Amino acid sequence: MDCCTESACSKPDDDILDIPLDDPGANAAAAKIQASFRGHMARKKIKSGECGRKGPGPGGPGGAGGARGGAGGGPSGD
């Protein structure tokens, strides 16, 4: 059974909603959705890159550099 031959798969143009593009609420919602998706893709990319590593990476236990634990300008915690 081919989905493309059925009339249920195709939407008529009447069902498409007309959304005003200058609506501030819609723009804010779109920005949040885009930021969420970009964060998801970044986490997915980082996760796939770390799966192939063995041992601690930079910034991890015994590693050097990174935002934590490196030689930075933050408080020393003494």
UniProtKB/Swiss-Prot annotation:
Q: Which GO terms describe its molecular function?
A: calmodulin binding; phosphatidic acid binding; phosphatidylinositol-3,4,5-trisphosphate binding
Q: Where is this site: Crucial for interaction with calmodulin?
A: 38
- Presence of the UniProt keyword ATP-binding in the record: no
Its keywords, alphabetically, are: Acetylation, Calmodulin-binding, Cell projection, Citrullination, Cytoplasm, Disulfide bond, Methylation, Phosphoprotein, Synapse
What are the disulphide bonds in this sequence?
3-51
Q: Example GO biological process term?
A: associative learning
Query: How does the annotation summarize its subunit structure?
Result: Interacts with apo-calmodulin; this interaction decreases the affinity of calmodulin for calcium ions.
Q: Which residues cross the membrane?
A: none
Concerning Pfam families, the annotation shows:
IQ
Gene designation: Nrgn
- Give the sites modified to Phosphoserine: 36
In terms of SMART domains, this protein maps to: IQ (SM00015)
Annotated organism of origin: Rattus norvegicus
| Residues found modified as Omega-N-methylarginine | 68
- The protein depicted here goes by the name Neurogranin
Q: What is known of its domains?
A: Neurogranin is intrinsically unstructured; however, upon binding with CaM, The IQ domain adopts a helical conformation.
UniProt record similarity statement:
Belongs to the neurogranin family.
